[in-house]
Amino acid sequence: MATLAYSIEVEGLEDETLVVRGFHGQESLSNSVFLGQACYGFRYEVQLASRVSNLTAEQMVDKRAELKLYRNSQLVQRVHGIVRAFSQGDIGHHHTFYQLTLVPALERLSLRHNSRIFQKQTVPEILSILLQEMGINDYAFALKRDGVQREFCVQYRESDIDFLHRLAAEEGLVYSFVHEAGKHTLYFSDASDSLSKLPEPIPYNALVGGAIDTPYIHGLTYRTQAEVSEVQLKDYSFKKPAYSFLQTVQGTELDYQQTRYQHFDAPGRYKDDVNGAAFSQIRLDYLRRHAHTATGQSNEPLLRAGYKFDLQEHLDPAMNRDWVVVSINHQGEQPQALQEDGGSGATTYSNQFSLIPGHLHWRAEPQPKPQVDGPMIATVVGPEGEEIFCDEHGRVKIHFPWDRYSNGNEQSSCWVRVSQGWAGSQYGFIAIPRIGHEVIVEFLNGDPDQPIITGRTYHATNTPPYTLPEHKTKTVLRTETHQGEGFNELSFEDQAGKEQIYLHAQKDFDGLIENDQFTQIKHNQHLTVEWESREAVTGEQVLSIEGSLHVKTGKVRVNEAGTEIHVKAGQKVVIEAGSEITVKAGGSFVKVDPAGVHLSGALVNLNSGGSAGSGSGFGGAMPALPGGLEPAVALAPPQTISYQALLQAEQANVPAVKVCPLAAQEATPAVNSITPPPPPPIAPPMAPPQPIMNPQPTANAQPNLGRSTKATPDFPTHFPKSSIGIENELAGLVVAMPANSAQKFGYVKSAQGDALFMLTKDMNQGSYQRPPSLQDGKNYQNWQTHTVELVSYPCEMDDKAAVETRKQAMLWLATHFTTHIDQSNHQPLAPIQSEDGRFVIEITNAKHVIAAGNGISAESQGQTITMTPSGQQATVGVAAKGFGTSATPELRLLESAPWYQKSLKSQFASLTSAENLDDKELAANVFAYLTSIYLKTAELAKKFGIYINEWDPMSEQITPNANGLTDPKVKNAWEILPRTKPSKIVEILSKSDAKAVMKHIKPQLQSRYSESLSKNVFQYFQDGGEVAGHGINNATVGDKHSPELAILFEFRTVPNELQSYLPKTESTTKSEVKLLDQFDPMKRKTVIQQVESLV
């Protein structure tokens, strides 16, 4: 039978000073808890005895020590560490009892607490700094994944050991220890493959008992439990605002459990796909670390946390495999150490352990990240000699007062974003904090690694522009000249009687007014120009002065007119000169000088009759006054709504207000009391019911075709969210266009409000649809659809009479429907006649939208939005001719679309500054438009799962367009791609310009999206792929009868599998008569009745 023995050595003591009575210890992969105390890899409580009775803490605490285990006098295991705690117990006749706690040197980091900043360093580099600062040089990394530099990593009010554990857990690192003579090495790994393995397998012995010389394992229990099956993380980066950063990782070995246990978290604490994928897998490994575990016992001292071993001789062959020791408890007793004091019994050793299968990776428990519980003060810093230091995003560097390690320069922090009062696409407000400014810093989600500047403050050194409180009534915007003296200022004085707006420009003042300027001065105006003053007016200039006009020049005054100068006075005109006055006309003149009056001409007539010449006279218009301020509107008093009106609102499914029980009792006698109907289901908010002002429509109701006197408004950028599956992906006008014809009938002038669609199909029917409240475009099953079919009469587009008839019929139908919508307490649509003879439908705040599927076209301004009869399609486009110098109207609308990135034009100009392009402006416009399409396609492909990289259109004989994407061979294909061929767009460029445009598109994709996605999107278009819609507006190049080229960008929001849930239009009447017959009064009355019964 094997004999066991234990001994211990402590730095500075003789080897035989202490004898081991017993020990109890725990080891674990990374940190754990042992006997209520933190265990940083290992922790042993060792019971000792010594003949020396006066050992002190100075001799023991913080000293190196080594516990050794012997079998048959051979050293088989050692535990090296430092003494964390030492205690003295009873004093006997021969021995004094002691106890010490043996821990790794790593535990020293738990005694340091700090706040500091690390920049552009990997986690292994940061951990190395922490260890080396504590004099720990025995450490090693065995990592499968390359460390990624962290731009900004903050240790914030936490101990060094907590900081180390937090970073290690985030990166999936675990640590264990390798014990050697005189040292223990801290060993970091991120995969089970990197762990050390015992050289010999360990046998399993199910029948404990008898004398067995070799160590063995017994009591092994294997446990499987259901855990999280999928992890999904999400984050955001301002550098890629449209990119979702969504990462999904599915677990493996899930046959025994359901796969619906998803763990979602945001933010995921990553800013790129590489880290996102790694962090998601690490999170899943941690959440599933208890899915497959085993526990057991043994007498093998070689078993240690962080080691692998092979098990053999188990009755279940599946258990004879490799295992990883996750944690293990060791117990040893050595009574013979006190033999002289009566100690007896055999020396024993045993352990209890926890395992995972060798192919799995153990992950440490993520440590909570310190939260910054409020704003901080910091100072803006930068290089010496600079006043303003920022990057292309307007970010600055800052220094925190608590940061003891930085020098207060440009290396003190990462680039920190600055909150601005208004931030749009190349518009808004920008004020860069300057070096030395004090700023208020907050942290996104309380994360110390994500600071953002949200405010600025004055202090004792940086004082306000004007002293306070003397100038407390001033509101001031004052800047300071960069690298010079002076300032610009706009200030407002609000002291009663001293109100003033003050504007100061240190150098130049430039102004540009694109249209009119109206200025009114109700008292004096003084203008002093110390150098030149020039004024140019291309039209007329009128100067009207009720008093006197005095003009004085120091030298010469010249008045020159192309046709006439007319001088007129009510009483007299005096022209005075010191030496000479000359009046000259043609070859004749009158000259007055000190020598006399000289008349010269072909003929001089005196009192010869005739009449004097006349001038044009004053004909200028008086200046217009500027618009006044709108007076404040008083709040309207509370409105009482009758119970009958509330009932009407309920029947119309229009939320109003809750019915008052007292009002209900007053409105209805108690004998015939009516229980108010239950409130309607939650729906998009609508206007409360109002008294119906419009009369019922008559059989002779005709559309209002009067000439519009309203100025054309700016086209809004609101698109109905409730009926589109993609939220806010498209903004613009709600319009319809002819799907297969060149005929243009009109356009929707403006549209606002959450719209429910009223559509017409093939110009033959009107469909009133009332969708329910939708959630992300889902729940299409419950649409309520009512349809009135007029005729099934075809109309050729080249039949002008038939086209005109259909237009009038659709106009009448629209008018009739809008009247009914108004009766449901909604603002009506007002068809009016446009200047070019086409009708216009204005939608100013309606809850419904009318469109004629083949009857209304958005030719105006080049903007096109299409609604198909099922309400699932929307298209926006711009005329191809709109690119270039004459593109202002079209591009103005195009640039309002959220997917269009206007800044790409200036980027292209910068990228091609050294290239000789034939038409730089046209190329920049094409580049911006195409790149916007490429980027939007990549974004939607990533967001909605368009797998354009999983199929080859050519090999499958599928046309690469939206119809091809609906092919069953394409997986999960949402039809959300723009339809147009880049080759058609670049045809308007020269070959060299087209080549330059295409060359610079791909890097734009790669800078925002993954390499694979960028490659596939780019290749898709290069292979001739077009994207949803009607091609290039069904235009045939070179055909003079073909419609004008229009480049379309279409979104289809209903996937194929949801088509069956769309509303089914049911006709209430069918007729084979021509449209013209519908204007027959009797038939018109029939249709009206049908509409009324439905609506």
UniProtKB/Swiss-Prot annotation:
Annotated function: Part of the type VI secretion system (T6SS) specialized secretion system, which delivers several virulence factors in both prokaryotic and eukaryotic cells during infection. Forms the spike at the tip of the elongating tube probably formed by hemolysin co-regulated protein/Hcp. Allows the delivery of the TseL antibacterial toxin to target cells where it exerts its toxicity. Also acts directly as an actin-directed toxin that catalyzes the covalent cross-linking of host cytoplasmic monomeric actin.
GO cellular component: extracellular region; host cell cytosol
Coiled coil: none
Binding positions for Mg(2+) 2 per the UniProt entry: E727, E789
Family from the record: Belongs to the VgrG protein family.
The protein, known as: Actin cross-linking toxin VgrG1
Provenance organism: Vibrio cholerae serotype O1 (strain ATCC 39541 / Classical Ogawa 395 / O395)
Binding site for ATP: S723, I724, G725, I726, E727, S792, R979
Subunit record text: Interacts with protein VC1417.
Pfam families per UniProt: ACD, Gp5_trimer_C, Phage_base_V, Phage_GPD
Enzyme class: ligase
E.C. number(s) listed in UniProt: 6.3.2.-
